[in-house]
Design a protein with these regions (language model features):
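Long, charge-rich, low-complexity alpha-helical segments
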Residues: 1-207, 216
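Conserved hydrophobic/aromatic beta-strand scaffold that supports enzyme active sites
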Residues: 285, 326, 395-397
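Small-aliphatic-rich amphipathic alpha-helix that forms the alpha element of a beta-alpha
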Residues: 237, 271, 327-329, 333-335, ...
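A generic secondary-structure signal for well-formed alpha-helical elements
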Residues: 140, 241, 245-248, 363, ...
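Short, electropositive alpha-helical surface patch
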Residues: 381-395
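C-terminal helix-cap and adjacent tail motif
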Residues: 392-409
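N-terminal amphipathic, basic helical "cap/leader" segment at the start of enzyme domains
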Residues: 145-321
Length: 409
């Protein structure tokens, strides 16, 4: 195991620590000054084998002294808030009760951490595995048994944990890692592509309904036999649900207020729209920018579109060729995880429910066919270049029923 001081501190110190069974022994045998530096979050620790760095611990910004980590318990478990992502230096594990992260610089480390996150049986029978667990412990990513509130697993989160964090992109287990720009305060997720399609704002009631009438009229309609909807209708349902009304940046986070209630204004929900036969949008996938209220079109082949439309047909009975549009709710787990620990998934499902009801009210007012779905249990992978891979935790289809016309016709 190697201890290092980052060069931005002023000078680099590399000290080989021989004979230490764990990184926690730094405070007892590494010297008083070294221990002080470690408490300040200045030192990083690497797992090195045959001159190759397998993983390294990157301390986050610390405003107070950092106490030595508590020993992790066995069986070894990652905290519910732990997740994998692409950071500035590649795959990394983050999301504990600190801003620390462990950069996974080898395929072995990625696969080991992915098994840990998937709650698979992790066998610790070699020095590298023990040292990697020490790194994860230093970063505050393992269950220690001391903080029951943040380490407790809710039943639903335990059941769906793998769905929100894991895919088959990396090895046998694989972490769901999106190639996103990393920021320590987890800002609102926005599309990466520059191309945008602006969506309008029209808060006027199309049918002149009162709120009570819209509540009474809403229902799950499975008829897309009318003239195709377009960006105006898609804009209306997104405007009433996911569009961000106000952003507020603080030292620790970026809070976003929407028209629906969200936990601490830290919702990790975003959306991908699949336009199957919209009259003014090309067939394809579009990532929604909730800040600017725009759609960012994907490019390249999108083989997953037909799979999603096939799922919608099986769940709703609407013919595959008649489906006009779908909305996929995507969870950016990292954004709320720092504050909500084990209840992130439950909180996100409540937010999906609120968004679906807002969409249902707008659809009733506009005479649209709106049908929430369930059972996708998939990701946005394969929807085209520019669409980041994320866990889909809710879906709905949107169209115009037979016997109705577009507004203005």
């Amino acid at each position: 195991m190697t201890v290092r001081m980052p060069p931005e501190v002023g000078r680099e110190i590399v000290a080989a620590v021989g004979g230490l069974s764990s990184a926690r022994e730094l405070t007892s045998r590494g010297g008083e000054e070294l221990a002080k530096l470690d408490a300040r979050g200045v030192l990083g620790v690497e797992v090195v084998r045959e001159q190759h760095v397998l993983a390294r611990h990157e301390p986050g910004t610390r405003r107070v002294r950092h106490s030595p980590p508590s020993p992790y318990v066995r069986p070894v478990r990652a905290l519910p808030s732990a997740h994998m992502r692409f950071g500035p230096d590649g795959p990394e594990l983050a999301g504990g009760n600190s801003a620390d992260r462990v950069v996974l610089t080898s395929t072995w480390a990625v696969e080991f951490a992915a098994r840990l996150i998937a709650r698979a049986d992790v066998e610790v029978d070699s020095a590298p595995e023990s040292e990697l667990l020490d790194l994860l412990s230093r970063a505050g990513l393992l269950v220690t048994g001391r903080n029951q509130h943040s380490e407790e697993w809710e039943f639903h989160d335990s059941l769906f944990h793998g769905a929100t964090r894991l895919d088959t992109s990396f090895g046998l287990y694989g972490a769901k890692i999106g190639t996103t720009h990393w920021e320590i305060d987890n800002p609102v997720r926005r599309p990466m592509t520059a191309e945008r399609i602006a969506l309008g704002h029209d808060d006027r009631s199309q049918e002149g309904m009162t709120l009570q009438e819209a509540i009474s009229a809403r229902s799950s309609l499975r008829d897309h036999g009318g003239p195709p909807i377009g960006s105006a209708e898609i804009s209306a349902v997104l405007d009433a649900s996911l569009r961000i009304r106000r952003l507020e940046r603080t030292v620790a986070s970026e809070r976003a207020w929407r028209s629906m209630p969200t936990g601490g204004a830290l919702s990790g929900l975003s959306a991908v729209v699949i336009a199957a036969s919209a009259h003014d949008l090309e067939r394809g996938a579009y990532e929604y920018d909730a800040v600017s209220h725009e759609l960012a079109p994907a490019s390249g082949p999108a083989p997953a579109i037909d799979r999603w439309l096939g799922l919608a047909h099986r769940l709703t009975g609407i013919p595959h060729t008649s489906i006009q549009a779908m909305v996929l709710f995507v969870l950016d787990y990292a954004r709320p995880a720092r504050s909500y620990d084990s209840i992130v998934y439950a909180t996100a499902l409540k937010e999906v429910g609120a968004a679906l009801q807002a969409m249902a009210l707008v659809s009733a007012d506009r005479g649209l066919s709106f049908c929430p779905m369930g059972g996708g249990f998939a990701t946005t992978a394969g929807l085209g270049e520019g669409i980041r891979t994320g866990a889909v935790i809710g879906e709905a289809v949107l169209g115009r029923p037979k016997g109705t016309e577009r507004a203005g016709e």
